[in-house]
Amino acid sequence: MKKENIPLFFATLQAANPEPRTELEYTTPFELLAAVLLSAQATDVGVNKATRKLFPVANTPQAIYDLGVEGLEEYIKTIGLYRSKAKHLIETSRMLVELHGGEVPRTRAELEALPGVGRKTANVVLNVAFGEATIAVDTHIFRMGNRTGLAPGKTPLDVELKLEKRVPPEYRLHAHHWLILHGRYICVARKPRCWECAVATFCDYKPKTPAPKTA
C-alpha cells in the first residue's frame, strides 16, 4: 500500500463507521478482561452467550474467584478450551483481589503478569477499557496487514509495530476496531469480498475477488 494512501484508507473506514465498538458485551474493565480471556479461539457470539449467564451471577474478581474452577466451568463450558480458560480466569481473579484491590491494572506489564494475558489481550484492554491507542493484532488484522500491504510482517508483533508507525495519529485510537471488523466481515480469509470493499482501491491484493454471478 502506498504511503500516501494510508490516510485515505483510514478516512474511508472512519466515514463508514465513525465510532467502532468491540462486539464483546461488557460493562466494566473486569468484564471486558474476562470476556477477552474467554475469546481465544472462540467467537464473540459464543463468548457473549456464555457471559450473559455468567456476569449476572459473578462479574467481579472476588465473585468469580468464589465460584471456583468447577463452578466457573459450568458457565463457560460451551466455549472452546473452557477448562484451561477457567483456571486462568480464577487465578487472574485471585491476583486482582490480592495484588490490585480487585481492580484491573492500567499498565501493560501488570496486565501481562496475569495468567492467560498476553500482548494481544493487554492491548485490547488498554484500548477498549482505558482509551489508549494500542493495536491488538489478531488473526484478522494479521491477515489484513499482509494482504493489503498496510503492514506486512511475519509475526503479529511485526504487524503491530508497523501499524504503530504507519497509522496516522488521528486514526490510532480506533484503528484496531476498524481493521478487525473489516477483516471479520469484508476482508475474510477465503474469497475476500472485494466487490463490497470501500477501500479496495488502496489495497495491494490482486486479483480482486469479483462479485458472485447472479442467476
Show the residue positions of the predicted features.
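Catalytic cores of DNA base-excision repair glycosylases
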Residues: 2-214
